[in-house]
Structures are given as C-alpha cells and as structure tokens.
Regions:
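Hydrophobic/aromatic beta-strand elements that line small-molecule binding cavities or substrate pockets
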Residues: 5-7, 59-65, 83-90, 101
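Short acidic, gly/pro-rich beta-turn/loop elements at beta-sheet edges
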Residues: 17, 56-58, 84, 98, ...
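Hydrophobic ligand-binding cavity/cleft-lining segments
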Residues: 1-41, 144
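Glycine-rich portal/gate segments that line the openings of hydrophobic small-molecule binding cavities
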Residues: 34-80, 92, 96, 128-144
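Non-catalytic surface loops within mature trypsin-like serine protease
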Residues: 11, 52, 90, 103-105
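A conserved amphipathic terminal alpha-helix motif
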Residues: 103-144
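Short, solvent-exposed aromatic-acidic interface loops
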Residues: 77-82, 100-106
Length: 144
C-alpha cells in the first residue's frame, strides 16, 4: 500500500519530532518499545505489536535517516514490511507534516485484501497523532 497525507499541525517542527520519537506515544491497541537507542537517532530501533482482525502482529522498525526538524525515514520488518517517511516544515506558527507510507502485510496473498483496512488504520493513526501532538503542545504552553 502506498499512501501520502499532508496536514497542518498546531505545533512547531521540534515539537512534532519530539512526539514522533516518543516510543510511548502510540495509538490504542499498539505497543512500541525501544530496542536500541542511537545518539544520532539513525539506527534507533523499536519492537512493536498490534492486532489486525484480532490476530497479534509483531515487527521491528529502524530509523534509517534523520534530519533534525525536517525528516525521518523508517524501515519496517516483520508483520508490516516497507518504509515510512515523515517530513515536517514550518507553517504559519505550526508545521506542515507529510506522512508517506510504502508498506504491506508480509503475506502477499493476504496483503491485497487487507490493504483497505491497513489504509483506514493508517489514516486513523495519523489523525490520532495530530490530535495528541496538539493536545500535548497546548498542555506545555505557559498560562497567564
């Protein structure tokens, strides 16, 4: 499944990346743990699990490229194989975030049938992330 989605997020690029690098910031039904943390982010790897159609799926994601405040690229292995690219640029006091995914379920015959479910879950997770980043950012702003 290939998909791209661009949206405005009411948070700075630094805040967006801080959220994306937090392994505890995962949608309901998904867990993620840091397996290896690299000082320059590239090489950092995460183990993850989620359920699809009630069946637990597992895998590993590795950060393969990182330009602070601009771009992160991840490679997925296991139940989901492929790449994800997150590009962020300043936009009217917030950020314009582009999510690109080129991934598939690791079983080719099943993958084509599950692509519509995968796309829907991906879009829901992106919307969840936007809401969580904005909620987190608002809670960090000084009041007064």
């Amino acid at each position: 499944m290939r998909a791209t989605k661009t949206m405005h997020v009411d948070a700075t690029p630094e805040q967006v990346f801080s959220f994306m690098l937090d392994s505890t910031a995962t949608p309901r039904g998904m867990t993620m743990d840091v397996v290896h943390e690299s000082p320059d982010v590239v090489g950092t790897s995460y183990e993850w699990t989620f359920k699809m159609l009630g069946i637990p799926r597992k895998g590993v994601t590795v950060c393969t490229d990182y330009v602070p405040g601009e771009r992160m690229v991840f490679r997925n292995f296991g139940a989901m194989e492929g790449t994800q690219t997150e590009t962020v640029e300043p936009d009217n006091g917030g950020s314009m975030v582009t999510h690109e995914m080129d991934s598939r379920i690791a079983v080719p015959l099943i993958s084509r049938f599950l692509d519509p479910l995968l796309r829907k879950a991906w879009e829901q997770n992106i919307e969840w992330g936007k809401q969580e980043i904005e909620k987190w950012t608002k809670s960090k702003k000084p009041t007064g």
